A protein has these predicted regions:
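Short alpha-helical functional segments enriched in proximate histidine and acidic residues
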Residues: 13-20, 107, 115-116
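FAD-binding core of flavoproteins
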Residues: 106-187
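Internal helix-loop-helix
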Residues: 43-111, 153-156
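Flavin-dependent oxidoreductase catalytic core characteristic
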Residues: 1-18, 136-141, 169
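Short, small-residue-enriched loops and turns at beta-alpha junctions
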Residues: 27-28, 56-59, 123-126
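Short secondary-structure junction/hinge motifs that connect adjacent elements
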Residues: 21-43
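Buried hydrophobic positions in well-ordered alpha/beta secondary-structure cores of metabolic enzymes
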Residues: 3, 14, 45, 52, ...
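Glycine-rich beta->alpha junctions and the first turn(s) of the following alpha-helix
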Residues: 1-2, 6, 74, 87, ...
Length: 187
């Protein structure tokens, strides 16, 4: 019953707000139309759907989320929901401490922060135990050294979460600001 409500709500929303012509305008606009669509999506609670209620989410389950994503696909929705909200948000929800969870999930759900997860490395076949990207501390600053590839939705992200290992082989999740002068990208 909940999935039917989600599906009907999303279908009506897209029928009213994302015709084929509107979608093409969004894709060719400078972002204003897209941002308007995101604001409306947030008002419907879609950004809070996958997250626990104690962090301001709606506590939806995987079936709720997949119902919504299926409707996104059927409507040719342009938001990288999985890569800029669901994947990084769930990483934060499961691996960050309580204060950081509250802080970042609130920003994901209510503000306009978009994240990307930078997990792919050459030659490791997605095995987290074979990470080559290193994190190290020097003069009270953290540094990353290594290569990552294919960061989905990075072009729209404010920040990127990067898994890296230290000298003792502990895995760290490092959040870097996409606008930092120290952030280098080949985009």
């Amino acid at each position: 019953e909940e999935q039917l409500l989600i599906k009907n709500s999303a279908e009506k929303f897209f029928l009213d707000n994302l015709s084929f012509e509107q979608r093409n305008k969004i894709l060719t606009s400078e972002g204003k139309l897209y941002e308007d669509l995101i604001v409306k999506s947030k008002e419907l609670g879609w950004y809070g759907l996958p997250f626990d209620q104690k962090f301001g989410g709606l506590g939806g389950n995987i079936t709720d989320v997949m119902t919504l994503i299926e409707t996104f696909g059927a409507s040719l929705h342009v938001d990288p929901y999985i890569f800029s909200l669901l994947l990084p948000g769930k990483i934060i929800e499961h691996f960050f401490d309580e204060d950081k969870k509250s802080h970042y999930l609130d920003k994901i759900i209510n503000d306009n922060i978009k994240l990307a997860y930078c997990f792919a490395e050459p030659n490791i076949r997605f095995d987290i135990h074979k990470l080559n990207c290193k994190v190290y501390l020097e003069e009270n600053k953290y540094f990353l050294k290594g290569k990552k590839m294919l960061v989905l939705a990075a072009d729209q992200a404010n920040s990127i979460i990067v898994p890296a290992i230290d000298k003792d082989k502990y895995v760290y999740l490092v959040k870097i600001d996409n606008t930092s002068k120290n952030f280098l990208s080949n985009k």
